[in-house]
Amino acid sequence: MLRYAIIFFVIAIIAAVFGFGGIAAGAAEIAKILFYIFVVIFLVTLLLGVVRR
């Protein structure tokens, strides 16, 4: 479960780089949305991993 949390975190960081780096207007908006979605998923899976221990 912690592995999924790390994967979602890496995806969130990649989405942040594209979203906040000014690549393209349309892609940046999509990346910002994906960034927040993946951060929430990361936190949920991180909490589930900690609780299951």
Swiss-Prot record:
Q: Where in the cell is it found?
A: Cell membrane
Record has Transmembrane helix as a keyword: yes
InterPro entries xref list: DUF1328
- Kindly state one GO CC term assigned in the UniProt record: plasma membrane
> A Pfam family name for this chain?
DUF1328
Highest taxon in the source lineage: Bacteria
Specify whether Membrane is a keyword of the entry. yes
Topology in membrane: Multi-pass membrane protein
Q: Which UniProt keywords apply?
A: Cell membrane, Membrane, Transmembrane, Transmembrane helix
Spell out the protein name for this chain.
UPF0391 membrane protein Bcep1808_5731
Q: Which organism is it from?
A: Burkholderia vietnamiensis (strain G4 / LMG 22486)
